[in-house]
Amino acid sequence: DKYNLELLVVDTQAPHQLNDGQYAQRRATCEQAAKILGVANLRVTADGIAKADDPFQALKETLDALPDETMKKRVRHVVTEIERVRSFVRAFASGDIEAAGRLFNASHDSLAADYEVTVPELDVAVDVARKNGAYGARMTGGGFGGSIIALVDKGRSQEVAQKIADEFEKQGFHAPRALAAYAAKSASREA
């Protein structure tokens, strides 16, 4: 509430397609990459890259150690996503909403290009939200269907959601469902 924002959540009504093994395959690829890199998990790799004198060079060297392009893409997504989350927390805490939005956008773009877990409904919803005033928008969850979230000014969720619904109708997609989420104090017990 401090920044006068709301989080628009849009369920694209695109069914999750996690039962065909694609999500598990990505996870297995990342686990295999961690073994090749000699680490317990890719968070260890991300931490090392973040602490390097030249993180870009450290990322390049990490990716160069991997045997194929698909694995490189998956690892690039995971490692850069870990850093994006850290950067988002810093940007949001400091009130830099524009930077926080750019990080949302970069996250979705990486999920689409490197992790390859988006579907047309997710990409259209994100694109429409971005073009209609969202600071940033991204898919959420495991992908292959499901929902997006968009960071918008308070009072704009309904307008942005309607633009998404209009575009979904044009594209022949199922009508999406949307809700606005607001920051609030945590629950507590009154004495």
PLM segments and residue spans:
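C-terminal nucleotide
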Residues: 1-136, 151-191
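Short beta-strand->loop micro-motif that forms the acidic, two-metal-ion catalytic signature
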Residues: 145-151
